[in-house]
Amino acid sequence: SEILSRLRENDDLKDIPIHFAIYKQSSEDSITPGEFITQATAEKSQTKLNEWHNINEKSALLPSSTAADYDENLNNNFKQFNDNLQSYFSNFTQAVGKVKFVDKKPQRLVVDLPIDYYGQAETIGITQYVTEQANKYFDKIDNYEIRIKDGNQPRALISKTKDDKEPQVHIYSN
């Protein structure tokens, strides 16, 4: 309430809602981001916060036991996605997925897919195949992004939001 009182002293912040959230930062060596754990709001002109509400949010790597605890089907689909890519492309290593669960449902998936770049034609072929696999395995996820990269160099981006009927595909020029 000390922070809220100080904010309310500012004329620009006197008559607007102010929202607070507590964020738990991940460990320094973690690949997944931290997460919001609770939130509260002070309505217009209020000097006290409403009740705090827990935020049921969790980030996990795919595949992993944490992801399987939240959505075993998604975890298995990601394994199959990787297996199919390894079967189709002899020089493919493995994709890394990060998923954000909200209320135990996958809300956002980000996949980093490393490739060895052999030319634009191969990038197009890989991107087409990955798009087919994404449609097959990630169709039930509202938002996903698959970043195809050669080292740090982006080669293609496949993304889909809940409003998209089909994934959006962008192949970067050399």
Language-model segments: residues:
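Hydrophobic, glycine-enriched assembly/anchoring segments
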Residues: 120, 141, 153-174
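Short edge beta-strands and adjacent turn/loop segments
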Residues: 89-115
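A short acidic (Asp/Glu
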Residues: 30-34, 123, 157-158
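A short amphipathic beta-strand at an alpha->beta junction
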Residues: 11-26, 137-159
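Extracytoplasmic/periplasmic, Sec-exported soluble proteins
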Residues: 66-73, 77, 103, 115-122, ...
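Terminal low-complexity, intrinsically disordered regions
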Residues: 1-55, 164-174
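Charged, low-complexity helical/coil segments in non-catalytic cytosolic or luminal regions
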Residues: 44-89
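Short, non-transmembrane amphipathic alpha-helical segments
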Residues: 1-12, 121-142
